[in-house]
Each structure stands twice: as C-alpha cells, then as structure tokens.
Amino acid sequence: MLTVNSYFEDKVKSIGFEQNSNAISVGVMLPGNYTFGTAAAEKMSVITGALTIKRSTDADWVTFSSGEDFSVEGNSSFEVKVEIETAYLCEYL
C-alpha cells in the first residue's frame, strides 16, 4: 500500500511503502529551509540534487549530493537547506 504525504505547504512530497517489513519513503524537496523531526532512526540517500543538513550533533552544516547518504538518530530533529529540486530515499531503521 502506498501512502502519499505532503509537508511545508506542498514543498516536500513523499510516497511511503513497505519492503520486507521495513518502512521506506521516496520523495522530492523543492528549494527552501525545513526542519524535520524523527521518531525512528533514518538513513537518507540523495537520489539527485543536494541536501545541506545540520543534525543536533553537528557543529557545522554538511552537504550531501547525488549518490551520498547520511543517518539521523531517532527521537531527534535535523535542519535541511535545499537549493535545487532534490529527490531522496528515506529508510526507517
């Protein structure tokens, strides 16, 4: 079953699904600044574009481009800066 979600006045959209009992979502972010909260740990992979992020444990902003990924702890939040339309894959760990 697919679950379609929209955030930040439709500037971030995702489609969620399950694979082998693991929750996954794939989506697109339009340019902007966003703050996301996490319930579970997440692995975010950038499919195309770039995400500049700052987790609560990061001293500085870090940019991840196409083909790169990063992890975020559960029960935390992270800030995201998007300068170009970016597609991502999120795996909930």
Curated annotation (Swiss-Prot):
Enzyme class (EC, first level): transferase
Any one GO cellular component localisation term in the record: cytosol
Enzyme Commission number(s) from the entry: 2.4.2.1, 2.4.2.2
SUPFAM superfamilies: RmlC-like cupins
A single GO molecular function term of this UniProt record: uridine phosphorylase activity
Pfam families referenced in this protein's UniProt entry, alphabetically: Ppnp
Keywords of the record: Glycosyltransferase, Transferase
Highest taxon above the source species: Bacteria
Signal sequence bounds: none
Reaction catalysed by this enzyme: a purine D-ribonucleoside + phosphate = a purine nucleobase + alpha-D-ribose 1-phosphate; adenosine + phosphate = alpha-D-ribose 1-phosphate + adenine; cytidine + phosphate = cytosine + alpha-D-ribose 1-phosphate; guanosine + phosphate = alpha-D-ribose 1-phosphate + guanine
InterPro entries: Ppnp, RmlC-like_jellyroll, RmlC_Cupin_sf
UniProt family annotation: Belongs to the nucleoside phosphorylase PpnP family.
HAMAP family per the UniProt record, alphabetical: Nucleos_phosphorylase_PpnP
Protein task: Catalyzes the phosphorolysis of diverse nucleosides, yielding D-ribose 1-phosphate and the respective free bases. Can use uridine, adenosine, guanosine, cytidine, thymidine, inosine and xanthosine as substrates. Also catalyzes the reverse reactions.
UniProt-recorded name of the protein: Pyrimidine/purine nucleoside phosphorylase
Organism this protein belongs to: Aliivibrio fischeri (strain ATCC 700601 / ES114) (Vibrio fischeri)
Species lineage: Bacteria, Pseudomonadati, Pseudomonadota, Gammaproteobacteria, Vibrionales
